[in-house]
Amino acid sequence: KKAVKPYLRQFLSDTRVIEPPPPRWIWKIILNAVILNLRPKKSAKAYQTVWNTHGEGSPLLSIAKYQKAEITSQLEKRAPAQFEVALGMCYGNPSMKSALAELESKGCKKIIVLPLYPQYAASSTGSVFDAVAKELLTWRNVPDLRFIRSYNEEDKYIDSLANSVKDYQNVYGKPDFLLMSYHGIPKRYFDKGDNYPCQCCKTTFRLAQKLDLKPDEYQMSFQSRLGFAEWMKEYTDQTLKALPSKGMKNVQVICPGFSADCLETIEEISEENKGYFMESGGEKFGYIPALNDRPDHIEFLTQLLLDNTYGWNN
């Protein structure tokens, strides 16, 4: 609980993540007086269920370290002694500050920032941009900087997703229905111009096309809503509760917007939402893991980085 509280304070204080209507001080009171006194205990219990499931400690951090190691290895093979790779997170550690300080100490003059969010959203990728910009404000010599905004339309990303589905189904069989669940955003963010849901639609359509799915064999949904405001629909939990009554009793779920498994996939989808589905009459539920450190995923990310060095001589 003590470890979760500072993380939640940092996360929920990010105005990219939570855009409270003015006056903002009302949200600060709610956050500090209510949420930070209730939420940490619940979140801590959830984290206990996923701790050490993918190595030591947080699954997200463990997988991110694997990804970093594999990408570093691939870059070294393809361009020896040309790249340094650092891992940074917007909230918690290793921080964005420590990652950029590491690159600065190694004399890096050209930096590519790759947020591991396939679909751009102001509340995710936008926060990464803000964190990087904040740290670079302190640099005397600002580096050449390239920022990869999104990669949801890259063919190799779609191929990796399709391969992960096929690999899973080769072991567990095909379901009646495939649900593609993405992290949700409040509808008013979309109304203000955030095209994240449109990118999710494109990913869903292309993946379904790659898997040769019929329209009645798949659906897109959004998870992790918070509070009482309307979020982008359809909601994942409500969708899973309704599927058995429609004859879909063997369901598999994939979360294409997560490059690494974390609390929201392992606990929220494969445990909590599985429970909703089974309690509603479902018979078989499968969660298809995130791309994590799959070789085809690492190969794609490595090539994406190399492609974004175009025009840099050294």
Where are these regions (language model features)?
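Active-site-proximal alpha-helix that buttresses catalytic centers in soluble enzyme cores
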Residues: K1-N314
